[in-house]
């Protein structure tokens, strides 16, 4: 079982993410974010980067063996979505509670603004979400049956005070760093 942070692995020069090797060995994987000061905590980017990296490796391997690209890409957008949802839930031993839309599971849902230009035209909704969306395209989020974001806005009443504390913390860290 591995938690992959493909953006960081590529950006820091650690080589190819483990995605392809884990697929080949039926390894279990989930995604994470790392080094938030250098990378956005955006799971769409993490999933997209991992999918693109594994497809790149497959294509290079095909060129090395046949001098041409693969006839068909063996790793789909649906595969990547499953890595981030039901597979991640399974790794946490929570796949009976979360990770898919099923009766009896918690209602954890993300709803997208379908009328955005980056989704038009949409022939494959999963590919459109993974390749063309980001946090800005999320209309609503439901966690355990309750809205936490609606109509594009976070609805936590504590958010303004949390943002204030975050700004104060950031100022203190920069001040302390510069004072050294």
Question: How would you name each of these model-derived features?
Answer:
Residues 17-116, 132:
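His/Asp/Glu-enriched, well-ordered alpha-helical/loop segment
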Residues 1-2, 29:
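Hydrophobic beta-strand scaffold residues
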Residues 3-16, 40-41:
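C-terminal active-site-proximal or functional interface alpha/beta core segments in diverse enzymes
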Residues 78-180:
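Active-site microenvironment of metallo-dependent hydrolases
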């Amino acid at each position: 079982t591995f938690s992959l942070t493909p953006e960081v692995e590529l950006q820091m020069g650690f080589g190819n993410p483990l995605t392809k090797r884990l697929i080949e060995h039926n390894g279990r994987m989930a995604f994470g974010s790392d080094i938030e000061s250098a990378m956005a905590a955006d799971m769409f980017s993490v999933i997209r980067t991992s999918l693109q990296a594994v497809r790149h490796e497959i294509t290079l391997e095909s060129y090395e063996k046949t001098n041409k690209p693969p006839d068909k890409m063996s790793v789909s957008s649906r595969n990547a979505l499953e890595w981030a949802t039901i597979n991640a839930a399974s790794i946490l031993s929570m796949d009976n509670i979360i990770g898919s839309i099923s009766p009896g599971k918690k209602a954890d849902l993300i709803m997208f603004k379908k009328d955005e230009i980056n989704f038009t035209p949409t022939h494959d909704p999963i590919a459109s979400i993974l390749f063309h969306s980001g946090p800005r395209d999320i209309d609503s989020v439901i966690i355990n049956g309750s809205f936490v974001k609606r109509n594009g806005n976070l609805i936590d009443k504590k958010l303004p005070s949390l943002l204030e504390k975050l700004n104060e913390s950031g100022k203190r860290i920069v001040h302390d760093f510069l004072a050294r």
